Amino acid sequence: MRTYEEHLAAVRAALPQPRVVSTPLSSAFGRRAAATYRAEYNLPPFDNSQMDGYALPTTHGGTFTVGRTIAAGDSPGSLPQGTALPIMTGAKVPEGTATIVPVEHCEPPHFPEEGATVTVPAAPEQFIRRAGSDVQAGTTLINEHALLDAPSIATLASQGLTEVLTFAPARILICTGGAEIGGTGEATIPDSNAPMLAALAAQYGIEVAGFVRTNDNPSALRADLAEAVITHHPDVIVTSGGISHGKFEVIRQIFEEDGWFGHVAQQPGGPQGLSRLGEVPVVCFPGNPISTLVSFRLYLAPVIGRAPAPFRATLTEPAEGLTGREQFRRGTISISDGTAEASFLGGTSSHLMSQAIGANVLIRIPADTQLSAGDLVEVFPLS
């Protein structure tokens, strides 16, 4: 029987490395950088005005002749003595500027015609954004594997980049079903796992290449999967159900010869499988809905998706660990006095999907332990 860490390592070793692609910056949000990016030049690239106001040659104030207006994008040259130059926000500051005073602090409190006079109060050096005050040339902007959010994209764009190298989202082929799934008889049930897996894939930045319905005929299912691989070119096949020891465990029948099927010392999601179909790895989860959800979060999302890292939280209620198996229970996180607190949500049975609504973490309960309220536990964010 494997531990959680052992099976995670096995899945990680079996799955392919992500492909590196050149991505337009406008489409890079939510992807991870496939290279480290450094600043080519300072940001801001030149001293510029933080306000609409006057560029002044002195901090002492006084009455000045109004010179030509400096708009954003102008090349201002130098600032003559005795002159106040109207300057707009973002405009390059002329040489010789000692300070900038907002127009509303002056008399008149608006911009008069060039050649008029303006009285300006004394002011220390202010409202000048210095070149390199945000980023200096040579500074690392984005590290490889960093998640590209809106500020990251803006910072890269400020360096004149229009494309970046990113890791392409992994593509999965989802295989779910069974004779009892989606039929019309009184003993059949709808397929909830396929849409759930698709939703989980979207949540963790994974693309769904296609779907295959399982049946109880191993040779027919193998042929369906082989055809789907040719059609959809997935990086990974993900299956749900059919991996235990029953009479109709069709996934196990197809893939056991070329893979590993066994148990991980956990609940839910104890039965697990890992195999290949030709060159495509196959990750096999148990079919109970909660087991599928937990398995996806623990073993697939952190390897080919963008799952948040686990962290420690304080348990709000006692919990007793199972003998020989650890648990990953659904729960919620709240913040109290700056401390993350974890509370259980719903029961522990693997079919209780509706009771998982609202859960935002999995709470890890070690085997053979007795936990009290206030103890620290490891939690795995679900979003």
Task: Give the ranges of each region predicted by the language model.
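Flexible glycine/proline-rich
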Residues: 2, 21, 25-26, 30, ...
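Short, glycine/charged-enriched hinge/interface segments at domain edges or termini
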Residues: 4, 10, 14, 55-213, ...
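Conserved active-site and cofactor/substrate-binding residues in soluble primary-metabolism enzymes
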Residues: 2-6, 20-23, 27, 41, ...
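Short, conserved secondary-structure segments in the cores of folded domains
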Residues: 45-46, 75, 83, 89, ...
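Helix-rich terminal scaffold detector
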Residues: 1-5, 162-285, 289-295, 299
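Generic secondary-structure signature for well-ordered alpha-helical cores
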Residues: 9-20, 34, 38, 133, ...
